[in-house]
Structures are given as structure tokens and as C-alpha cells.
């Protein structure tokens, strides 16, 4: 490649990336996933589009996609709170293993019938499209205030179900590539254990070593993110090299680092945020360039049947069967999880495996994977907001600071500065600072008024439009935001939790005459907390609800995992 070709490559690449970024606001206006915009730009620039760029280098696409996916998973792991595992780990693992196997089997049978394939070839198609995609799930759920049990289950599933899909895909390719090979139970069991076992061991072990290395190093601030990124990629590659799941490993590395006091954590997250956007744009641009839309015309009708069969039948059946042991999921939760079986880059990456292995019919597998991904993003991704509203799993948005930044005085420092702008309707307007009930361990460090810095004292009175810089830790964020911030306006806020709020220490006997409750010996001595535990189990989450004696009871407040208050909706409002 000469200098002119290199410059042309840079020019075209930068132009496509810039166009993708500038078109990103269109996704919110049209209600379609932003990843679809990036993919569309790549397709339009490709062989069948106005750009006319001929790109058929599957090895390069495989390299770019794996690198991008690794970065996305590292960032996603660092932003996942380990506390969410309390309510979502086992359901997510059930979906990541049994769910993928069930989806693969049903989709494989449909593919074999629709495309007149051998049953093993059909199963290979099912394995390729059998797992949800972490990049798509993290991107579309980011910033949404979902029921914690549902949101965490979807995120953990998407970060941990790829080993099962890779295991099934690689196994079936080995069998189809060797006519003498057999489906040995011991061979499959060993491969399965290697994928998950090595992935978990290297992810957690490597994450611990990388965490120690980061905290012991004294580097320029900008170098910590490079150390984390390079270390994560080393663990990802080592896991893949040894036969484990690199995808699972790097997700666990991010999870470990994100939930430990890590030096430079905030600057690392800021850099990774930008890297994740670059990765998403680059990955979907390259995959879009790789696709020749005219190749999909021959398979569009059976392809639609396969995609909708997976969306409407295979995925829901897999979810309902996988979640049977977990009674805490309501029917609405299960339907929403079924609908958010988003496919994205991973199926396309897996579809490259048969191409690189030289299997007969590999182009069909690739085209089918691409077709299923397009339908999934268009149908499931575009309807995500509507589905969340209908399933009632989206919570009213929480009040948050307008910005937050770390105060990394010590390697293990968890101090942050939260910035709030006071609106006119906050009760603290006109009140002196000494009368505010601030959470323990927090302090107002500065007050800005009309672009002027004030030196706050106990007698300083707050005014509308004041900007407050508050020093505190993440554990105090909810209390501080409720005190100073303003949640985004939405019509659903007043109705979601109900019009009446009850402290969980109140006895049902005291509520009986007010709400017409009929109590017996078993319920007469119960408190509201006892009722919630009896109906929802030991791990309720915000927004959980149940129907009892014609009233809708909604978990409206939690503190350290304990329900503090409950909202009540009357029958006419439910």
C-alpha cells in the first residue's frame, strides 16, 4: 500500500465515521437503534450502495469486530454494579446456557426446514444466531431506568451467553468439516467446561492481577486507561488462545475493576466511553461494508420466516423454560426479556467462522446471520421503548446531578464531586445551608450564582439557578439527588408508584379500615414489610409490584436492599 492509498483510506474512514456521528441524532427522532444508523452508513458506502466500495476481506472484518467487541465488553463490565448480581446472576446464567441451547435447537430445526439443509447445518445456523449481543444490549439499555432485576438479567446474559454460542458453533463446524467426526458427549462436555471454566478463571484472576498492577503503578493520568485496555486485551487473547471464552474473560475483567477501588477509575471510564463509541462505529461500518444487499434478495422470504420464528417463538420459549425456577419474574418481566433478545455483531462474527473454515454453504450462513441481525435491530430494537412501557418494566427516571467527576486523592479514593443546578420548585430555595439535612459524609464545597463563586457558610441561603458542587461518595448519590436535583418530566411518574405511600413498618391492621383490607389470623399481625417479603421473596427491587386484596402494591423505596416504603394504587387506577 503506497502513501496515496493510505491517505485515501484515512480520508474515507474518517468521512464515514464523521457521517455516522452526524447522523446519530436521526436515530432518536426516528425511534431506531443508533447501531442501525452505523450499519446503514456502511451498507450505503459498500458495493451495492452509492459509495461503491468493494470490501470482501473477512479476516480484516473478523479482526476489527473482535477488537471492538472486546473494548465494548470491557467498558460494559466496568459499568455493571456487582450488587445487581444479587438478583440476576442465576437467571442470567440459565438464559446464557439453557436459553441459548433451546434457541439454537428450535431455530436450527426451522432453518433446516426453510432452506432444505441437513439437520447439522440447520443447527449451525441456530448456533450462529443463538446468542444475544452485548454491544446491542448495552447500547440500547444504556441510560434507561429499567426494573433492576430485568435490566441486570439482560446485561449479564448478553455478557455471558457468547461462550455457549461459540462452543456450539465451533463444535458443529468441526463436525461438518470432518465427516468422520461424531457428537461425542465427552468431547462436548470438555469443550463446554473449557469455554466457561477458563473464561471465568482467567477473567477473575487476570482482573485481580490487573487491578493490583494499576493500583501499584504511578503513571500519568492518561496512561491508566491504556494500561487497563492493553491488559484487558491480553487476557482476552490469552483466554481465546487457551480454548476459553475471551468474551467472558474481558467482561469479568471489567466487572472486577469497576467494582473495586481502582486508581484513575473515572478517567479510565471517560476514555473507555469514547473508545466504545469508536468501536461501535468502526465495527458496524466494517460489517456494513462487508454486506452485499443484493445477495439477500434470494433469501428474503424464508429469511423473514426464520427471523420472526426466532423472535416470536424460539426466544420466548427459551426464556420461559429457562426462567421456570425463578418465581420472582412476573409474566410481564418474562415477555419483555423475551422481546429484548437483540442480535448484533456477535452472530455476524460467528458467521465468519464457517467462511474462514471453508465450509460448503458458508455464504448462506453469513447472509442469514446478517438478515436476522437486520430484522432484530429493526423490529426489536426500534420497539424497545414501547415494549418497556407495555410491560411496565421501565421506572420513572431518577434525579441525577448534571455532572460528576472523581476526586482521586488516594488510589482507593471513592470521593466524587456532584454538580447540581437548583430549579425553582425545590423546597430548599430560600433555606440557609445549616437547615439542610445533608447525608453523613457529604459537604457543599462551592456555590456558583450568576457565574460568580460564593464561599458558602451555614447562613448562606440558596436561590433558584444556583449551581452546587457537593463532595460525597456514590452511596450518598441518591439522597443528594433527591435533595437537589430534578428528575426529567414524564406523565408516568405520578401514576407509577401510586398516589399513596406507606412505610413498611406500618401494621396491616392499621391500614385495614382505610383500604378495606380483610385480615385473618395469619395476616393480622403482619407489617407491610412482612407482606412484601411473603409476596416478592427476599430480594425485591424498585418497581416490583403485586396484586393483593384488589390493591396494587409497588416497591417505591429501597435502602441497602431493604424495602423502606410501598406505593398503593387503587383498583380504578391499576
From Swiss-Prot:
UniProt xrefs under Gene3D superfamilies: 1.20.1530.20, Regulator of K+ conductance, C-terminal domain
Compartmental location: Cell inner membrane
A GO biological-process term: cell volume homeostasis
Domain RCK C-terminal: residue ranges: 405-486
GO CC annotation terms, alphabetical: plasma membrane
InterPro entries tied to this protein: Cation/H_exchanger_TM (IPR006153), FAD-bd_PCMH-like_sf (IPR036318), Na+/solute_symporter_sf (IPR038770), NhaP2 (IPR023729), RCK_C (IPR006037), RCK_C_sf (IPR036721), Transptr-assoc_dom (IPR005170)
Domain of life of the native organism: Bacteria
Transmembrane annotation, as ranges: 6-26, 34-54, 58-78, 87-107, 109-129, 173-193, 196-216, 219-239, 242-262, 271-291, 299-319, 335-355, 359-379
Keyword Oxidoreductase: no
Membrane topology of this protein: Multi-pass membrane protein
Primary residence: membrane
GO MF annotation list: flavin adenine dinucleotide binding; potassium:proton antiporter activity
Keyword line: Antiport, Cell inner membrane, Cell membrane, Ion transport, Membrane, Potassium, Potassium transport, Transmembrane, Transmembrane helix, Transport
One Pfam family linked to the record: TrkA_C
Family the entry assigns: Belongs to the monovalent cation:proton antiporter 1 (CPA1) transporter (TC 2.A.36) family. NhaP2 subfamily.
Family matches, as NCBIfam families: PRK05326.1-1, PRK05326.1-2, PRK05326.1-3
Protein name in the entry: K(+)/H(+) antiporter NhaP2
Gene (name only): nhaP2
Amino acid at each position: 500500500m503506497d502513501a496515496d492509498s493510505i491517505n485515501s483510506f484515512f480520508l474515507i474512514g474518517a468521512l464515514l465515521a464523521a457521517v455516522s456521528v452526524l447522523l446519530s441524532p436521526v436515530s432518536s427522532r426516528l425511534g431506531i437503534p443508533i447501531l442501525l444508523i452505523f450499519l446503514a452508513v456502511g451498507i450505503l458506502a459498500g458495493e451495492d450502495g452509492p459509495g461503491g466500495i468493494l470490501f470482501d476481506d473477512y479476516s480484516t472484518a473478523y479482526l476489527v469486530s473482535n477488537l471492538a467487541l472486546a473494548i465494548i465488553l470491557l467498558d460494559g463490565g466496568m459499568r455493571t454494579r456487582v450488587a445487581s448480581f444479587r438478583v440476576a446472576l442465576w437467571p442470567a446464567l440459565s438464559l446464557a446456557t439453557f436459553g441459548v441451547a433451546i434457541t439454537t435447537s428450535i431455530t436450527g430445526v426451522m432453518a433446516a426446514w426453510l432452506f432444505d439443509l441437513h439437520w447439522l447445518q440447520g443447527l449451525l445456523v441456530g448456533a450462529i444466531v443463538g446468542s444475544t449481543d452485548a454491544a446491542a444490549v448495552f447500547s440500547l439499555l444504556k441510560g434507561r431506568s429499567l426494573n433492576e432485576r430485568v435490566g441486570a438479567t439482560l446485561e449479564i446474559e448478553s455478557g455471558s451467553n457468547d461462550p455457549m454460542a461459540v462452543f456450539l458453533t465451533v463444535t458443529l463446524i468441526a463436525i461438518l468439516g470432518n465427516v468422520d467426526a461424531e457428537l461425542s458427549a465427552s468431547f462436548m462436555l470438555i469443550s463446554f467446561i473449557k469455554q466457561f471454566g477458563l473464561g471465568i478463571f482467567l477473567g477473575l484472576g487476570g482482573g485481580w492481577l490487573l487491578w493490583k498492577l494499576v493500583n501499584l503503578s504511578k503513571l500519568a493520568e492518561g496512561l491508566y486507561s491504556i494500561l487497563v485496555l492493553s491488559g484487558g486485551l491480553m487476557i482476552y487473547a490469552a483466554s481465546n488462545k487457551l480454548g476459553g471464552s475471551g468474551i467472558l474473560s474481558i467482561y469479568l475483567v471489567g466487572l472486577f475493576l469497576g467494582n473495586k477501588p481502582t486508581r484513575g477509575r473515572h478517567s479510565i471510564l471517560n476514555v473507555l466511553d469514547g473508545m466504545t463509541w469508536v468501536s461501535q462505529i468502526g465495527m458496524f461500518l466494517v460489517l456494513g461494508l462487508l454486506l452485499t444487499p443484493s445477495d439477500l434478495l434470494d433469501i428474503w422470504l424464508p429469511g423473514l420466516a426464520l427471523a420472526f420464528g426466532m423472535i416470536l417463538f424460539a426466544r420466548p420459549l427459551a426464556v420461559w423454560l429457562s426462567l421456570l425456577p425463578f418465581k420472582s419474574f412476573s409474566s410481564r418481566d418474562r415477555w419483555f426479556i423475551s422481546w429484548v433478545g437483540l442480535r448484533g455483531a456477535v452472530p455476524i462474527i460467528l458467521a465468519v467462522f464457517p467462511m474462514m473454515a471453508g465450509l460448503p454453504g458458508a455464504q448462506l450462513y453469513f447472509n442469514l446471520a446478517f438478515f436476522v441481525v437486520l430484522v432484530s435491530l429493526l423490529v426489536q430494537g426500534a420497539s424497545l421503548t414501547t415494549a418497556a412501557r407495555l410491560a411496565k418494566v421501565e421506572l420513572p427516571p431518577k434525579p441525577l446531578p448534571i455532572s460528576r467527576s472523581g476526586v482521586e486523592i488516594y488510589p482507593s479514593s471513592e470521593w466524587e464531586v456532584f454538580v447540581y443546578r437548583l430549579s425553582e420548585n425545590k423546597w430548599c430555595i430560600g433555606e440557609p445551608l445549616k437547615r439542610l439535612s445533608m447525608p453523613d459524609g457529604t459537604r457543599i464545597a462551592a456555590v456558583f450564582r450568576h457565574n460568580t463563586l460564593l464561599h458558602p457558610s451555614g447562613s448562606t441561603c440558596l436561590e433558584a439557578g444556583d449551581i452546587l458542587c457537593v463532595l460525597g461518595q456514590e452511596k450518598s448519590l441518591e439522597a443528594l439527588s433527591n435533595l437537589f436535583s430534578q428528575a426529567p418530566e414524564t406523565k408516568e411518574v405520578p401514576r407509577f408508584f401510586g398516589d399513596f405511600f406507606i412505610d413498611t413498618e406500618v401494621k396491616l391492621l392499621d391500614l385495614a379500615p382505610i383500604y378495606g383490607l380483610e385480615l385473618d389470623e395469619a395476616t393480622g399481625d403482619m407489617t407491610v414489610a412482612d407482606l412484601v417479603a411473603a409476596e416478592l421473596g427476599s430480594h425485591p427491587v424498585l418497581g416490583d409490584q403485586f396484586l393483593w386484596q384488589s390493591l396494587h402494591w409497588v416497591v417505591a423505596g429501597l435502602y441497602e436492599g431493604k424495602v423502606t416504603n410501598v406505593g398503593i394504587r387503587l383498583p380504578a387506577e391499576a
